[in-house]
Amino acid sequence: MEKEHNLSKNQKIIFDIIDKSGGPMKAYSILFDVQKKGIKAPLQVYRALDKLVEIGKIHKIESRNAFIACQNSSCQISKATAFSICESCENVSEISNSKLSKYLSNFSDNSGMKYSKYNLEFFGLCKKC
């Protein structure tokens, strides 16, 4: 069950921009877009991004240092994310696969490493490329 979060004004503005972008956005691109809506300081953007990541509304694509809207509501409660990233067009797709989650959970149990979250990124070429 997805937990409902009350977003602040800044969080809502930033989430809407990321969600409508259709792909990953870097923090300074977000700042450029939100300045027209009254958010002027980078710190305001970073605080909102941190909170949106924390509650699972967006994800950070570590290899691109960019943010993307969550495409799968179940990861908002599991803290487990995986992405396929096209090396040519840079299209990013969120992977929601219960078998992958189960495998990583078993791996964690067998290795003795208890993870608090994971963010996997797989690279290759998409069907279009």
Where are the language model's segments positioned?
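Non-DNA-binding regulatory cores of transcription-related proteins
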Residues: 60, 64, 68-129
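Short acidic, hydrophobic short linear motifs in intrinsically disordered regions
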Residues: 24-34
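Short amphipathic alpha-helical elements of helix-turn-helix/winged-helix folds
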Residues: 13-21, 33, 55
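Key DNA-contact positions within bacterial/archaeal DNA-binding proteins
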Residues: 43
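Short, hydrophobic-biased segments on the C-terminal half of alpha helices
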Residues: 46-50
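A short, conserved structural fragment
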Residues: 53-61
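Short, basic interhelical loop/turn and adjoining N-cap
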Residues: 36-40
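Short alpha-helical segments that sit at the start of domains
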Residues: 1-16
